Amino acid sequence: MEDDQCYKDVGESIAVIGMSCRFPGTATSPQGLWEMIKNKNTAWSEIPPDRVNMDGFYHPDGQRQGSISFRGAHFLLQDLARFDAAFFSVTEEEAKAMDPQQRLLLETSYEAIENAGLRIEDLGGSDTSVFVGSFVKDYEQVSLRDAHYQPRYAATGTGNAILANRISYFYDLQGPSMTIDTGCSGSLVAIHQACETLRHGESSIAFAAGAGVILTPNTMMPMTALNFLSPDGRSFSFDARANGYGRGEGVGFVVLKRLTDALRDQDPIRAVIRGTGICQDGRTPGIVFPSTKAQVSNITSVYHKAGLSFDQTAYVECHGTGTRAGDFVELSAVAATLAANRPQDSPIIVGSVKPNIGHLEGAAGVAGLIKSVLVLEKGVIPPQANFMTGNPRVDFQEFRLKVPTDLCQWPLPGLRRVSINCFGFGGTNAHAILDEAEFHVKGQRPPSIGRLATVAETEEIMVEEDSATPLPQLFTFTSPDQQGVVRIMHQYADHIRDTLEFKTTEDLNNLSYTLNCRRSQFDWKGYVVANTQEELAETLDSTDVDKAVRSKTRPHPKIAFLFGGQGAQFPGMGSELFYRFEVFRSSLEAATEYLLEHLGSQFNLLTEILRIQDESVIHKPSISQPATTAIQMGIVDLMKACNVHPSSAVGHSSGEIAAAYACGMISREDAWTIAFYRGACAEQMSIRLSGPRCQGLMCAVSMSEDDMRGYLSRESVSDTIQVACINSPKSVTISGDASGIRLIAAELKERDVYHRILDVPVAYHSYHMKYVDSEYKACLQDLPMDFCPGIAPMFSSVTGSRMELGVQSSRYWADNLTSPVLFSDAMKIMLQESHPDLLLEMGPQSTLRTSIADILDDMFAGRRINLAPRYVSAMARGNNETYSVLSALGELWSYGCNVDMQGLVKK
């Protein structure tokens, strides 16, 4: 037998990774079921008049032909006619013909998939199998009653095979798929078959379910005639009042996976199935009479094949039909096996969910399994409802059995284990053994892994921080319709506000991971960024429908990367990203090391970037240039780690360095080299030369190129002041002597023309730069000269056209320093040729926002607004950098980009 403390072999064990249910009363979810059974509540009610007119069928004598001897049962509270047909791609005409069992199975299948953290898009085409236990076909009787008015799709709407096949069809599952009818053991048999397909390698994932609804008296009358059903409509499991079972309706659904695979994929393991087995009674005194011998044989066989002893099993979820004969037979089997070696003062605990929700027949086994999973998770055993005095045929003390009447603690030390037993009215028995999950996952995962955690092989993007520090997190939401996104957000707000589960950073991290990485993707999407429970709930609550956007119809939206030039730098830029994202941090550290070791830098780049404002010299050209480029490249690396790649790129002035790197046209070492010497040469020029003409400034002006050139000509300053950058049809940057720039700025102020003097002490793209042209080229003479096409086209702001040759040459980068910046032309050509869906600015600030808006207005004026690409900025000064980057990723994701969110959550 086994040694639980040294258990290693998990090859044959099966993990329960997801479950959902629609059971009677308030047990509409596993948590709802737990609340019901914990409090000994029942879902019994009188039979609703919209199901059966009991005045026409009730008679206390169950032997009376055509009568029913009870007035109550256990029903779902929901309207069975309500069904989200569109979500499941079902037409209105098909939906009318569909058995409610099919509808409920579809709904619970989706909920179980979500609970398992699986995504619909990953299931399509897989070998996932589906097994459904079923017993009744009430809807077929109802819908086919009138031969002259039968639904067109009645064959597929009521066919028993379609209960399983409909699920396989909707999700495009290509593993085994079948409906199983063994009477009331059907769904536990379905679970057994699901486990077998996993054990034999036929499937990688298996769905198992059971279903049943009560719609017609025609099913009840034959069962009444055979004394199956209680005249009280209730189940009194193990009780002296046992007089038949009380019917119930509902659906239970579980998702199963081999334990080794579930551990590998970091799935949320709810419990572990150690063994399952089925057998048949054979000949008994009557076909509906159960057999103690057969059940003993099955229980013993399942434990033997699993290599387990009976000693560690503390609880048995029995079939517990509530018939005196059936209860006696089953409890005798439990006594002869699981309880045989128990001390009398330590009996095995037995229970049944049937008094709470009724006998669900085809769904009874899966209901017992879901209850058992909850018992293992909670570590307590709930009291038995409808139990007062034990069945007089059962000597509970002699049998070493106990029926709990109050919530009780787990009676045995160590591993928690339960058994589930079922038997069908035709003699098919089923048994399953479940272990708690914790024992099997302990030591298999890193200590920080939550209920849902990222795949172990995923690249680490995040920097580890103190879990007590609130970290901004991205939370994504998706739905097939726009209103659905907002509705889900508001529901999450209520849940987060009302629960104690989201008090720490780790809790929010787990939620972020689940929403971002373990949820199916639909057309409509929305996102929020928050770092506390309160902020998250408040932001979700305040979200309106306009924040939900529809993804682009193109499978992979095209993203143009845009890079600003000098003047965007500021003290501490990138510091928040440095402390949050490992990819960004590594990129800056590598740049710093390269500048020090290979380029002879006299400063530590990282130190200069992280300096506080009072100590910062970030505006010195020798520092600002390599720092800005390093920040831009770090953002590129971060985006690429999240699977965000450019379809094209445009750089403004020195922004072309990072643009060429992003497109794969130059190496990162070459990019750092170009930026380092660009800054060094610009600074040396101002130091080496003297005189007022060497003091340079730049100024951005809201004026067209033609108007500005005319203005400079009229003022006779075109020799000392040049149009350095054509940013957009409405904006230019002028550059030249500082004194002239200040005079023009004063005049523009008087004329109420918007302008802004840039925070750069050098007149880039003016005649000043001719003094360092040769020196800069000499510094770059060792750059590779062979043209590399890269992974995406770059559109040059030096030539105003697509880059074909020369980006690796020193001549090109000297022109980039000295020539006018034709950003507007480059953008227009890029938009015409590349047709991007999104424009993503990468830099310390969103300096290009206004220019891009002007260009888009000029190009798309008079056209439909959705033809213009959407602008997104990775960073914006004044905003938390992590918020900005996460918001940018959320924006890209919302528009249909396949953003890899795996590394954005702390592991």
Predicted regions and their residues:
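Flexible catalytic loop/linker elements that gate and position reactive groups at enzyme active sites
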Residues: 19-22, 41-42, 290-305, 419-559, ...
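Short Gly/Thr/Asp-enriched flexible loops that form oxyanion-binding sites at enzyme active sites
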Residues: 325-333, 845-862
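Short, low-complexity connector segments at domain boundaries
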Residues: 1-22, 58-59, 64-66, 80, ...
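Flexible, low-complexity linker/boundary loops enriched in proline and small hydrophobic residues
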Residues: 17, 67, 71-79, 405, ...
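Condensing-enzyme catalytic core of the thiolase-fold
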Residues: 2-461, 616, 637, 667-670, ...
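Short beta-alpha connecting loops at secondary-structure transitions
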Residues: 148-152, 180, 235-243, 280-286, ...
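Acyltransferase
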Residues: 275-276, 280-286, 538-539, 544-547, ...
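Active-site machinery of serine-nucleophile hydrolases
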Residues: 563-611
